[in-house]
Each structure stands twice: as structure tokens, then as C-alpha cells.
């Protein structure tokens, strides 16, 4: 495995959609009359010289994103982009976590109470914020120190500069709760080397900071203990020049490389199995390998896959495969269709069932519907990718400002 220089830009397999030349618990968003301060406290603002920082500050929920948090982030980033006094922006988390994803417990209760419109509004605003990040006109930095799961990746990986640390843990475990990797995940996972994206999406396998550097998800690596030095240095900058910001981030580099146990050393096996056409073929090939050679990695991987929702596995594989040939806005559009179909229980209630089993009752015995891969039909999967207008004549497609913020492929 090739060694990499921490805090130096790697050659990025992720060609993020942007319009600049440098490569670079749920509720609706209501009026906040009673508790504006509470919502503001969940996303703090820090200003230094010519920069602004958004700090996720919901540590009791591991900085899980609520609807008000997403709304505040979107408003802040929009205003900062328009403010000529601000040269670049930064996002980080308080405590030991960057962002553990969406606040799915509140979503679970909201759906069960029949408030699906709240859920739809959350996803709409979340995906619009991801698109804003991916087309941002100013340099933006994400410091992914600590747990970075689910849409925590979606709100950070579009950034021009993506800093991982020795405390970073990235994972997309959505299939384990009957959902799918979203918030742009079908874009950035599909652009990882080989079929690594399919593997991460179907198993929920974790990556550490060094592995994120090695595969291109992160642009810089920094020891957690050195973050204050980096933040102090970039906080003094008065420029919007990405090259200057790059040099400042690169000041505290170390030589790092994935250790011998890293899953990245199994990329040939990953490509061999996860490059197959269907989930059934992936499982069958790995079962044959495990039986013939007693391959422990195959056994562990099979266990991870078989714990997931069969429907989610098939939806997720198709989502990643389609995302490989789509722009960011197209990925977000098809992810929005999947999410809305999931929370509306049009085909299945696996999302709520997965949350119940893992986070509510904690019996870890979800009753998936359908219960087996062979029971998941093509029509079921296709329903999740069908425009809303073709299902119920509604006009509930995700509307992104592509005319004003046109992406490139």
C-alpha cells in the first residue's frame, strides 16, 4: 500500500461537482419562536479574521442532525457565501464526534405519528445543503474528527478540503436499519477505487482516517492533538486563495499508511466479489470462497451483509451503480426518491423496523419485509427510483438550483 504524506493533497478520485475552477431529533423547519436560542446552540458560529466556522453542538445525540440544525447550516452557508468580508468557511463538531448522521429516532417517531411531511422536508433541506456544499463558491473545510457516519459524510465530503484525524471513523451503516447511503453517498462512494464503494455501502464497514486518505475520501490527515495548532494557523488567514489554505493545512503533516489489517489491502478480493452484478451473486461467490478456503474475511463480510435489510441491499447496490454515471445533483435526486419512498412506506416499512430493532427495543431482531433476497422483486426496487409524478401524479421531486449553481461532471 502506497504511503501518503499526511496533510498533503492526495490525487483525488473524487472529482467533486463544483462551480469553481480549483479542484478542489426530526421536525419540520417550523417557526422557532419558543426556542430560537436552543436551535442556535446546536450549531455554534465562530469567527476568526476572514473565516467563519460552523460547529455542530449536539453532543448528547453525538451531533446527530436535526431539521433545525440543517436549516441553520444552510442559512449560514448561504449568507457566508454572499458576504465579501468572508474568505473561507469551516465545519467541525464539538466533543468527540463530528456527526453521527441524521437523528433517526425522531424521524421514527414522526413517521409512526403520520407526520411524513416533516420527514420529507428534512431530506429536502439536507440534500439542498449537500448540493450547496458541493457547488460552494468559496474554499470550505471540514474537520472530520471523531465519528462521521451516514449523512455526516454527506455534509463534509463535498468540501474542498476534508481533514481526517487519528480519531476519525467513517461508516455508512444505513442498510442495517433498512435505509440506504444518502446525502450524496451514491456520488462519492461510487467514485472510490474499484468496487470499494459497493463494499462499504453493503456492509457498513468502517474506515479510519488513514484509510480515508489512502482511498481519497479525505484530502488531509492530522493527529487529533495537533488540531488546535492547525485551527490557530488557518484562523489567522486573510485570503481566499486555496493554495495558501492548502499550505496552512499542510504544516503539520506526518507520514502515514494503512496498517496490515486494513481492508484496503483486500481491494482485489473486494473487486472480485463486489464487482458482480447482483447481491445474490456477491453472496453466492463469497459463500463458495468461505466454504472452500475458510476465508475469515469472507465469513465476516457475509455476516455483515446478511444482517441487513434484503430490500435495502438491492436498492443500495443499484443506487451506487447508477451514481457512478451521474452528477451530484442527479445522485441527490435519485436518493431523494428512495428516501421519500422509504419513509412513506410505499413498498416496505423496513426503515422504521430497522430503527425499532436497533435503537428503540434494541432486540436486534428486525423482521424485514420482504424477509429474503429472493422475495425482493425488480418492481419493488424500481419503485424506489421512479419519479413521484409517475407514482401518484404529485410534484414532490427534489428541486435543486442547477440553473444558478450548475455542476459539471
From Swiss-Prot:
At the top level of its lineage, which domain of life is listed?
A: Eukaryota
The transit peptide extends across: 1-26
Task: Give the start-end ranges of region Disordered.
Answer: 388-409
Q: Name one GO cellular component term.
A: ribonucleoprotein complex
The subcellular location is: Mitochondrion
> Per its UniProt record, what InterPro entries does this chain match?
ClpP/crotonase-like_dom_sf, ECH_dom, HIBYL-CoA-H
Keywords carried by this UniProt record: Hydrolase, Mitochondrion, Ribonucleoprotein, Ribosomal protein, Transit peptide
Its EC number(s): 3.1.2.-
Q: What class of enzyme is it?
A: hydrolase
Extract one GO molecular function annotation from the record: 3-hydroxyisobutyryl-CoA hydrolase activity
Q: How does it assemble?
A: Component of the mitochondrial ribosome small subunit.
Identify its protein family: Belongs to the enoyl-CoA hydratase/isomerase family. Mitochondrion-specific ribosomal protein mS47 subfamily.
Q: What is the protein name for this chain?
A: Small ribosomal subunit protein mS47
Amino acid at each position: 500500500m502506497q504511503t501518503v504524506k499526511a496533510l498533503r493533497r492526495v490525487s483525488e478520485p473524487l472529482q467533486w461537482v463544483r462551480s469553481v475552477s480549483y479542484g478542489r431529533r426530526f421536525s419540520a423547519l417550523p417557526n422557532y419562536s419558543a426556542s430560537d436560542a436552543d436551535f442556535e446552540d446546536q450549531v455554534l458560529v465562530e469567527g476568526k479574521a476572514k473565516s467563519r466556522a460552523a460547529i455542530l453542538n449536539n453532543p448528547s445525540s453525538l451531533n446527530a442532525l436535526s431539521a433545525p440544525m440543517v436549516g441553520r447550516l444552510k442559512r449560514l452557508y448561504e449568507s457566508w457565501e454572499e458576504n465579501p468580508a468572508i474568505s473561507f468557511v469551516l465545519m467541525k463538531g464539538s466533543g468527540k464526534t463530528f456527526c453521527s448522521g441524521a437523528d433517526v429516532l425522531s424521524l421514527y417517531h414522526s413517521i409512526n405519528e403520520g407526520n411524513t411531511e416533516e420527514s420529507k422536508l428534512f431530506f429536502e433541506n439536507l440534500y439542498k445543503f449537500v448540493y450547496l456544499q458541493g457547488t460552494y463558491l468559496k474554499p470550505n473545510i471540514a474537520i472530520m474528527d471523531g465519528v462521521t457516519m451516514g449523512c455526516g459524510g454527506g455534509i463534509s465530503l463535498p468540501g474542498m478540503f476534508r481533514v481526517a484525524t487519528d480519531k476519525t471513523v467513517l461508516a455508512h451503516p444505513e442498510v442495517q436499519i433498512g435505509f440506504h447511503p444518502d446525502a450524496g453517498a451514491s456520488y462519492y462512494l461510487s467514485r472510490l477505487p474499484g468496487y470499494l464503494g459497493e463494499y462499504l455501502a453493503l456492509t457498513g464497514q468502517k474506515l479510519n482516517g488513514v484509510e480515508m486518505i489512502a482511498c481519497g475520501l479525505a484530502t488531509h490527515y492530522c493527529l487529533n492533538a495537533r488540531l488546535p495548532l492547525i485551527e490557530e494557523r488557518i484562523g489567522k488567514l486573510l485570503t481566499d486563495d486555496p493554495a495558501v489554505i492548502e499550505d496552512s493545512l499542510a504544516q503539520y503533516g506526518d507520514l502515514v499508511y494503512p496498517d496490515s489489517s486494513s481492508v484496503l489491502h483486500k481491494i482485489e478480493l473486494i473487486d472480485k466479489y463486489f464487482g458482480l452484478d447482483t447481491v445474490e451473486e456477491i453472496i453466492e461467490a463469497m459463500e463458495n470462497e468461505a466454504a472452500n478456503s475458510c476465508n475469515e474475511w469472507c465469513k465476516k463480510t457475509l455476516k455483515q451483509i446478511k444482517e441487513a435489510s434484503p430490500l435495502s441491499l438491492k436498492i443500495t447496490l443499484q443506487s451506487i451503480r447508477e451514481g457512478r454515471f451521474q452528477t451530484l445533483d442527479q445522485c441527490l435526486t435519485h436518493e431523494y426518491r428512495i428516501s421519500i419512498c422509504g419513509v412513506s412506506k410505499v413498498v416496505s416499512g423496513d426503515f422504521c423496523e430497522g430503527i425499532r430493532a436497533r435503537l428503540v427495543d434494541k432486540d436486534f431482531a428486525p423482521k424485514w419485509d420482504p424477509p429474503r433476497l429472493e422475495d425482493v422483486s425488480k418492481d419493488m426496487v424500481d419503485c424506489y427510483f421512479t419519479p413521484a409524478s409517475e407514482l401518484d401524479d404529485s410534484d414532490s421531486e427534489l428541486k435543486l438550483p442547477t440553473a444558478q449553481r450548475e455542476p459539471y461532471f
